């Protein structure tokens, strides 16, 4: 894509055209103290595309990150690695009186199943409010080996938005009064797993979404 652009504009382009105010920090974002890098009072937005990694494929270091962020043995450590960025970002903005909005691309699994009554319940109890949501879409890229994953984009913060909330579905956008963790214009509801045996005699489901 870069070469094609150069052919069109007839000039060489820098891959990373950073000329001034360069402030890149290299390291594990989940282990770093964000406030030591930049004070939240200097920010208006936090945006990113954190890695999606399921429990069955994460590394030992990633499992360690999950335990550090959520606590050893907590149910959230069984969910997708990407939720660590949500808590890290919310904890960060909760230390400041500045209104900061956050938006992350994530696997859509964080808005399904056990993720909602566990991860999202804790987020909302800690002050999170969803401001906008782009509902499930298939991830696409120019890579030869594309990841087979469905994504969402969720914008949230720790303050109530004064203007309308929006839910995006493909080419359609809909105004919403309230966006719940299922990315619906509806009140927050918490559908928990059942501990009783199925009434129809079928075996219990052990893995699924």
Features from the language model and the residues they span:
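Conserved residues in the N-terminal Rossmann fold of short-chain dehydrogenase/reductase
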Residues: 25-26
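Signature of N6-adenine DNA methyltransferases within the class I
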Residues: 1-14, 18-19, 29-209
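Short, conserved active-site loop motifs that form the nucleotide-linked donor/cofactor pocket
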Residues: 22
């Amino acid at each position: 894509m870069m070469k094609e652009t150069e052919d069109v504009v007839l000039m060489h382009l820098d891959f990373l055209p950073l000329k001034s105010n360069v402030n890149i920090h290299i390291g594990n974002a989940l282990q770093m103290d964000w406030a030591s890098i930049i004070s939240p009072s200097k920010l208006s937005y936090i945006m990113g595309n954190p890695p999606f990694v399921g429990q069955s494929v994460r590394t030992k270091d990633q499992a360690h990150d999950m335990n550090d962020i959520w606590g050893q043995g907590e149910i959230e450590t069984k969910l997708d690695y990407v939720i660590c960025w949500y808590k890290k970002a919310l904890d960060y903005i909760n230390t400041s009186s500045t209104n900061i909005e956050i938006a992350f691309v994530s696997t859509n699994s964080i808005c399904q199943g056990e993720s909602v009554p566990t991860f999202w319940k804790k987020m909302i109890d800690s002050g999170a409010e969803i401001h906008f949501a782009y509902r499930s879409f298939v991830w696409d890229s120019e890579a030869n080996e594309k990841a087979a994953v469905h994504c969402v984009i969720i914008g949230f913060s720790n303050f109530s938005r004064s203007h309308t909330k929006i839910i995006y579905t493909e080419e359609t956008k809909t105004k919403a009064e309230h966006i719940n963790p299922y990315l619906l214009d509806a009140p927050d509801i918490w559908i928990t797993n059942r501990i009783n045996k199925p009434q129809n005699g079928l075996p219990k489901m052990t893995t699924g979404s």
